[in-house]
């Protein structure tokens, strides 16, 4: 193989080209690559942080959902207890009212019975006096009549 001037000239030109590239072309390319690498690393870090934040948010939402369900169950249980209590109170009030109405009706019946008995006594007394007058054939005066009625009423 012959080394001639063309090969040396091409080698010198190539060396100048390499030095030129190392001096002027290579630094901006390296800077651009480093910036791109930094952006990619920052993006990956941001994605990791976002994934962690999402995980924490999902845990927090799950916890809040469990708490809300527990609160809802507690409210429902309290409502059921309150409803049962209201039913018991209404039942007790109805029983008390029924007892009161029953006692009032019983008192009215007693009062009516007594007034009917008194009226019946008076009628029986009048009938007895009328019958006695017919039997005796004479009239009895008012005072004697009242006295007889009272005696009969007391006996009846």
UniProtKB/Swiss-Prot annotation:
Function as written in the Swiss-Prot or TrEMBL entry: F(1)F(0) ATP synthase produces ATP from ADP in the presence of a proton or sodium gradient. F-type ATPases consist of two structural domains, F(1) containing the extramembraneous catalytic core and F(0) containing the membrane proton channel, linked together by a central stalk and a peripheral stalk. During catalysis, ATP synthesis in the catalytic domain of F(1) is coupled via a rotary mechanism of the central stalk subunits to proton translocation. Component of the F(0) channel, it forms part of the peripheral stalk, linking F(1) to F(0).
Family matches, as PANTHER family: ATP SYNTHASE SUBUNIT B, ATP SYNTHASE SUBUNIT B', CHLOROPLASTIC
The keyword 4Fe-4S appears for this protein: no
Gene Ontology molecular function: proton-transporting ATP synthase activity, rotational mechanism; proton-transporting ATPase activity, rotational mechanism
Name of the gene encoding the protein in the UniProt record: atpF
GO cellular component labels: plasma membrane; proton-transporting ATP synthase complex
Localisation per UniProt entry: Cell inner membrane
Gene3D superfamilies: 6.10.250.1580
Family matches, as InterPro entries: ATP_synth_B-like_membr_sf, ATP_synth_b/b'su_bac/chlpt, ATP_synth_F0_bsu_bac, ATP_synthase_B_chain
Main subcellular localisation: membrane
Record note on quaternary structure: F-type ATPases have 2 components, F(1) - the catalytic core - and F(0) - the membrane proton channel. F(1) has five subunits: alpha(3), beta(3), gamma(1), delta(1), epsilon(1). F(0) has three main subunits: a(1), b(2) and c(10-14). The alpha and beta chains form an alternating ring which encloses part of the gamma chain. F(1) is attached to F(0) by a central stalk formed by the gamma and epsilon chains, while a peripheral stalk is formed by the delta and b chains.
Membrane recorded as keyword: yes
Entry-linked SUPFAM superfamilies: F1F0 ATP synthase subunit B, membrane domain (SSF81573)
Family, per entry: Belongs to the ATPase B chain family.
Membrane topology term: Single-pass membrane protein
Name recorded for this polypeptide: ATP synthase subunit b
Keyword list, A-Z: ATP synthesis, Cell inner membrane, Cell membrane, CF(0), Hydrogen ion transport, Ion transport, Membrane, Transmembrane, Transmembrane helix, Transport
């Amino acid at each position: 193989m012959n080394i001639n001037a063309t090969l040396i000239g091409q080698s010198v030109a190539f060396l100048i080209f390499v030095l030129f590239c190392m001096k002027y072309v290579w630094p901006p390319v390296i800077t651009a690559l480093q910036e791109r690498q930094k952006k990619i690393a920052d993006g990956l870090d941001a994605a990791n942080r976002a994934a962690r934040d999402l995980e924490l948010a999902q845990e927090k939402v799950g916890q809040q959902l469990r708490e809300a369900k527990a609160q809802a169950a507690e409210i429902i249980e309290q409502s059921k207890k309150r409803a049962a209590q209201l039913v018991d109170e209404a039942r007790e009030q109805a029983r008390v009212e029924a007892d009161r109405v029953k006692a009032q009706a019983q008192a009215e019946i007693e009062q009516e019975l007594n007034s009917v008995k008194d009226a019946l006594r008076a009628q029986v007394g009048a009938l007895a006096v009328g019958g006695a007058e017919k039997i005796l054939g004479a009239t009895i005066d008012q005072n004697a009549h009242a006295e007889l009625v009272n005696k009969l009423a007391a006996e009846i």
